[in-house]
């Protein structure tokens, strides 16, 4: 069986280092897909915590080629504001695309911008802007329900921008989620574990099944359980075209490696 530890793997660079270029390319492709879905000129409003991952992924010239005219950092709107006039956005384009994590502060900010636009335009008049949101790494049901509750779900286009591991160096990968520890240990929110499991599954699709998983602590154990469950679901589920996730010869269609689910175990 060929796995991430196979020195003869075609996805390994010289000197035994793993070639992480596919991860960078995957992130760039996901971002390009979102930008291309809005062909018109667009303004980006960006969650400041995404500055690091985005800077590692794209440059200004590439953004301009895909119709990005202006970029601004998102600023959190105070929940106590009684008027929406002060939260109107002044974008130079009709298309506005938010890039943010699915956090309450940002969906409230987006709602405040939408309400200000609606009030300024009048209930029966077209809005000045068209709103799209790319949630990193993916939308949550809470986001969808929030927009539905406030009557703007149909007016806001939502995408999932699956940015997972950022390539910091040839041997350093990071999820670049500075609030993960606070969510896990203070808020009791295990969403970061779910996102981490998805990211680790992506690694397995590229390089093959992890032959060994080692962790320490309750949260590491929960992450491992999530990863094992997702791997089993992946192996047991057919894709959208009806093709088996595992070929008849027992290899993974993503990696070409021999699949043996029993190799995925915890120590």
Region roles according to the model:
Residues 1-267:
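Extended, well-folded catalytic/binding cores that form a central cleft or groove in large enzyme
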């Amino acid at each position: 069986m060929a796995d991430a530890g196979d020195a003869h793997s075609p996805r390994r660079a010289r000197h035994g280092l793993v070639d992480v270029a596919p991860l960078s390319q995957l992130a760039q492709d996901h971002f390009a897909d979102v930008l291309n879905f809005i062909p018109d000129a667009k303004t980006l409003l960006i969650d400041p915590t995404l500055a690091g991952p985005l800077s590692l992924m794209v440059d200004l010239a590439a953004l301009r080629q895909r119709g990005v005219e202006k970029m601004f950092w998102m600023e959190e709107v105070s929940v106590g504001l009684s008027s929406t006039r002060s939260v109107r956005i002044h974008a130079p384009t009709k298309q506005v695309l938010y890039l943010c994590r699915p956090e309450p502060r940002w969906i409230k900010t987006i709602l405040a911008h939408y309400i200000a636009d609606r009030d300024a335009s009048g209930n029966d008049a077209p809005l000045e802007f068209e709103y799209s949101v790319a949630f990193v790494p993916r939308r949550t049901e809470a986001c969808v329900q929030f927009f539905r509750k406030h009557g703007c779900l149909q007016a806001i286009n939502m995408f999932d921008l699956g940015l997972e591991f950022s390539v910091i160096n040839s041997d350093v990968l990071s999820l670049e989620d500075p609030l993960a520890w606070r969510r896990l240990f203070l808020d009791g929110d295990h969403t970061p574990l779910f996102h981490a499991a998805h990211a680790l599954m992506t690694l397995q699709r590229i390089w093959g099944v992890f032959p060994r998983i080692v962790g320490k602590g309750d949260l590491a154990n929960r992450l491992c359980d999530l990863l094992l469950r997702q791997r089993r679901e992946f192996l047991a589920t057919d894709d959208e075209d009806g093709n088996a996730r595992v070929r008849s010869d027992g290899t993974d269609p993503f990696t070409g490696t021999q699949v043996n689910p029993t190799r995925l175990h915890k120590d």
